[in-house]
Amino acid sequence: MPAPDLDTAQQFHAAAEDAVRTGEFGPVVALLAPDVECVTPQHTRSGVDAMIEELSRVRPPETFEVEFEDGHWKELGNGRYSCETHAHFRLKVTGEVSYSRDRSFDVTIREGKVSRYEMRFAD
């Protein structure tokens, strides 16, 4: 597994999770190719702005906080890596889990940048 590409995939994933929690997208932008392709079950879009818009839509309302549990990364070949994530959305007032989501993420790394991001609902 090319360590630099895997490192970039892991850095991107961590930055995206932090951005969902905090609203700070600068570290995400630094890892994106200008023409990054963002694929979700609803649509496919291209560009950094589209990627940030997609991550912004995932941010929980102010009454919730989100915690992530990440699975192991898998190499898919040709600069592609996959990871499954379980997100717990907790009420800030009580700390109780209100709902959870399972997602699978694939990222493609080209020239040290994320060139493609795909989110799927995990099986």
Question: Residue ranges of each PLM-predicted region?
Answer:
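Short, surface-exposed coil-to-beta transition loops
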Residues: 66-68, 84, 98-105
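Short, solvent-exposed loop/turn segments at secondary-structure boundaries
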Residues: 42-43, 81, 94-97
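Hydrophobic alpha-helical core bundles mediating ligand binding, dimerization, or RNAP-core interactions
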Residues: 13-16, 20, 32, 51, ...
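Short beta-strand edge/turn micro-motifs at domain boundaries
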Residues: 80, 100-123
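A solvent-exposed, acidic/Ser-Thr-rich amphipathic alpha-helical stretch
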Residues: 25-29, 33-76
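A short hydrophobic beta-strand element
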Residues: 77-89
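Short, cysteine-centered beta-strand-loop-beta hairpins and adjacent loop/turn segments enriched
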Residues: 61-63, 88-99
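Short, low-complexity N-terminal intrinsically disordered segments enriched in polar/charged residues
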Residues: 1-34
